[in-house]
Amino acid sequence: MKAYKRVIRQNPPYEIEFNARIAMTEVMSGSQSKKMIRRLKRMAASDKNKDYLDQVYYAIGNIYMSQKDTLNAISAYEKGNSGSTRNGIEKGVLLLKLGDIYWERERYNDAQRCYGEAIGLLDKERKDYEELSRRSKVLDELVPYTDAVHLQDSLQALAKMDEKQRNEAID
């Protein structure tokens, strides 16, 4: 922690300062997670960081994951994905993490979306690239069928409703 503060005090180029601030949040103790999230959200709101939103929200998502708060982690990762402007390795890492969460939760459509985009952003030399590639191919084949099952389930649920409930659901 002291080393990161020392780096920031030396007025380095902004990208180095930014990375030091992100790294500081990762080494803070778990009891300071609310403080870390507030600090990162302030960073996300700053115009200086608009090109780094994927990294900021990735760090926020990781804090939530360390607290076993998957719902808020997914929300943070999705914000990082939608706010990303550079489409670099950082976004690929974020999408891989998000895809893994969706895979574990059996939300295969969302996992396919994340893995499909991540595969084009990440280096083929990564140790987990083969697994990413395998999952992406499996999901490309699986998702059309799971989508059909979800559609049929929804249609059958609508068919079982009385007319008033069905009309409310449709509207």
Regions found by a protein language model. Name each.
Residues M1-D171:
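Acidic, polar-rich low-complexity tracts and alpha-helical solenoid repeat scaffolds
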